């Protein structure tokens, strides 16, 4: 068997079109002490990870007090009663069958981990020594210096593990005669140490208990900038070179409300997840995985991933079936739905009649009624014979949590559930958000849409705290078992793993609080998609024999770059694809102050010549009344270096033209 080889050194230097001094740039990495095996109970057996190797080992130290979780009161911050009560109820109901608790997931081994990573990032050809093809060159040309270093590190680990596997191992004397030590005695109950165990040492005390009573509380009213223009790993590398972490800032997150973050709107506007076409959106997860790996490398953390077990159960029904199977059945009724209809019905029932119910989500419903309702839904849901007005809110909330727990694949996915759980290991709050942001982008579309619907509902519950007595922290602790204890892993937990439960609750709390930020596509990722599309477009022109076209376009781009502002057109021609026969082209003056909202305003005035919108109107989408129904119009960027992108009303047309001179602008009626 031939030995797998890496790229030759000469070709490795071409991994990215960046002025690198070496094939694998040396990026400084933080040394962060972590609790080993902290989240092993989530289904991954102890093993190697994708993170950097040979890190210096440090003795365990408590997380600093300024990294404590956000709470609304000191007494509440120490309370995890909602979590333990929920776990106890799950145990009493015995929802998870014993035979279902087998080998659901296992952690990937070294070598296999890197091979899977390269495959998920679209760089699997590099591991086989096949050289750089067009797809690899296009992707690698978009990467930053820290991202290139992450790719090089995975290739190096893969090559070393492949060489070790091919060599015949030297037999150890213990392999022949065996060895016996008292440490190998199995526990009496035959269960390995995959539990939430109590931490008694003072070094591992809860950060809340070690926090100073007079900690920084002024952060509650602060609004910090969350920069998405540059890669998160590049930001972390800069902070590390500046003796990160610095005193104060987001690292000093004490008790009280979570600080607020603001995404600065650049000249190109903000891009939400739903703004990009499906073709462009498919390019985001590989880029996000490379960036997340690079960020964890800089922070000195291990990015743990698991292999998902194969689903052998039924693919029909409502409870205990995969999300994609649910959506396939739903599409027969509503072809455009993106969230399971059952979940929508449960959330709608709770929003109408349960938001003001005291203890909603925490107080259990009647188990007899819940079981009967589940059976009725399985039988009559699609026939529309379920009367939701008669469903008790507590029964509906119980059924909601049961629906999540019964998913054969966790909502946060088996592959990335350990990564979600390890987010609290990051000391800096802003960097935790960066990691969470990338993890959300890695979720499959059905999981991401379902999670978004759930988080929107949880935010509404927390907003009614005065009536339902459920704070954001209460809501988070109650929902942890349904999100972090997936099917196939019964909750054999002891009432001592408070820190571990707090960490999971913190993740849920952050996802609810910052969901608008998390469902934004970072500007640097959109820029990488543009570069990737541009590279693929130029290569396809050459492959199709359009050499003259490609050379002509190259010269045009070069001339435009040389002429600068003189080549910029004075008028923007915008196509109109809305259902309005009176207009098919709109001309708008193109100057540095022209924004998308001005285009929509001008378009509305053309449709209704006598109407003038009120000054100071906050509606940038120019709602128009037509046939007594409000009509919303949107502007899209189509073609060029982007497939399709819905434009932010505050985006500037001149900057959009410079970013994508070969694209077009189109006005369409909103699909909703």
Swiss-Prot record:
It comes from the Eukaryota. One of its GO terms (molecular function) is GTPase activator activity. Residues 43-68 are annotated as: Disordered. The record marks 362 as: Arginine finger. Residues 47-59 have a biased composition (Polar residues). The keyword Transferase does not apply. Keywords: GTPase activation. Residues 321-519 form the Rho-GAP domain. The keyword Transcription does not apply. InterPro entries: Rho_GTPase_activation_prot, RhoGAP_dom. One of its GO terms (biological process) is signal transduction. GTPase activator for the Rho-type GTPases by converting them to an inactive GDP-bound state. This is Rho GTPase-activating protein 40. It comes from Mus musculus (Mouse).
């Amino acid at each position: 068997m031939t030995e797998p080889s890496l790229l030759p050194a000469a070709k490795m230097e071409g991994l990215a079109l960046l002025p690198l001094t070496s094939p694998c740039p040396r990026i400084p990495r933080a040394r962060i002490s972590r609790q080993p095996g902290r989240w092993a109970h989530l289904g991954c057996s102890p093993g190697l990870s994708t993170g950097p190797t040979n890190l210096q080992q440090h003795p365990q130290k408590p997380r600093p007090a300024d990294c404590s979780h956000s709470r609304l009161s000191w007494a509440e911050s120490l309370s995890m009663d909602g979590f333990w009560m929920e776990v106890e109820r799950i145990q009493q109901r015995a929802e998870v069958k014993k035979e279902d608790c087998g080998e659901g997931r296992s952690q990937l081994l070294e070598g296999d981990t890197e091979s899977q990573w390269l495959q998920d990032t679209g760089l699997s050809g590099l591991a086989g020594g096949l050289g750089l093809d067009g797809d690899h060159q296009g992707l690698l040309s978009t990467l930053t210096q820290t991202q290139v270093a992450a790719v090089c590190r995975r290739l190096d680990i893969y090559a070393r593990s492949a060489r070790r596997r091919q060599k015949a191992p030297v037999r150890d004397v213990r392999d022949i005669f065996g060895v016996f030590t008292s440490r190998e005695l199995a526990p009496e109950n035959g269960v390995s140490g995959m539990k939430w165990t109590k931490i008694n040492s003072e070094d591992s005390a809860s950060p809340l208990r070690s926090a100073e009573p007079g900690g920084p509380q002024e952060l509650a009213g602060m609004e910090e900038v969350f920069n998405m223009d540059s890669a998160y790993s590049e930001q972390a590398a800069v902070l590390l070179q500046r003796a990160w972490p610095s005193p104060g800032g987001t690292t000093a997150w004490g008790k009280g409300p979570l600080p607020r973050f603001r995404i600065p709107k650049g000249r190109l506007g903000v891009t939400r997840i739903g703004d990009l076409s499906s073709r462009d959106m498919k390019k985001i997860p590989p880029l996000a995985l490379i960036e997340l790996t690079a960020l964890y490398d800089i922070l000195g953390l291990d990015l743990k991933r698991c292999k998902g077990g194969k689903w052998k159960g039924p693919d029909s029904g409502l409870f205990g079936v995969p999300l994609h199977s649910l959506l396939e059945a739903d599409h027969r009724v509503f072809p455009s739905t993106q969230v399971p209809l059952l979940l929508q019905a449960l959330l709608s029932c709770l929003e109408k009649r349960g938001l003001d119910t005291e203890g909603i989500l925490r107080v259990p419903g009647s188990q007899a009624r819940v079981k009967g309702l589940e059976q009725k839904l399985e039988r009559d849901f699609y026939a529309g014979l379920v009367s939701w007005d008669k469903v008790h809110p507590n029964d509906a909330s119980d059924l909601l949590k049961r629906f999540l727990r019964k998913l054969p694949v966790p909502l946060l996915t088996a592959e990335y559930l350990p990564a979600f759980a390890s987010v609290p290991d990051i000391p800096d709050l802003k960097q935790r958000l960066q990691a969470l942001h990338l993890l959300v982008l890695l979720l499959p579309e059905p999981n991401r849409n379902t999670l978004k619907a759930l988080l929107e509902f949880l935010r509404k519950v927390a907003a009614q705290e005065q009536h339902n007595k459920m704070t954001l922290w209460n809501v988070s602790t109650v929902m942890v078992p349904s999100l972090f204890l997936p099917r196939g892993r019964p909750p054999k937990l002891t009432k001592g793993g408070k820190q571990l439960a707090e960490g999971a609750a913190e993740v849920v709390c952050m996802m609810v609080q910052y969901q608008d930020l998390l469902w934004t596509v970072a500007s640097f990722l959109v820029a990488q998609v543009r570069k990737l599309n541009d590279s693929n477009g130029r290569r396809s022109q050459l492959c199709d024999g359009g050499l003259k076209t490609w050379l002509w376009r190259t010269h045009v781009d070069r001339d435009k770059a040389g002429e600068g502002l003189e080549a910029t057109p004075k008028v923007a021609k915008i196509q109109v694809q809305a259902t309005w026969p009176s207009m098919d082209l709109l001309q708008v003056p193109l100057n540095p102050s022209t924004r998308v909202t001005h285009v929509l305003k001008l378009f509305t005035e053309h449709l209704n010549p006598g109407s003038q919108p009120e000054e100071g109107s906050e509606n940038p989408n120019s709602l128009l009344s037509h046939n007594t129904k409000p009509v919303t119009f949107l502007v899209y960027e189509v073609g060029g270096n982007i497939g399709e992108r819905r434009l932010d009303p505050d985006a500037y047309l001149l900057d959009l033209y410079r970013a994508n001179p070969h694209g077009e602008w189109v006005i369409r009626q909103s699909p909703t």
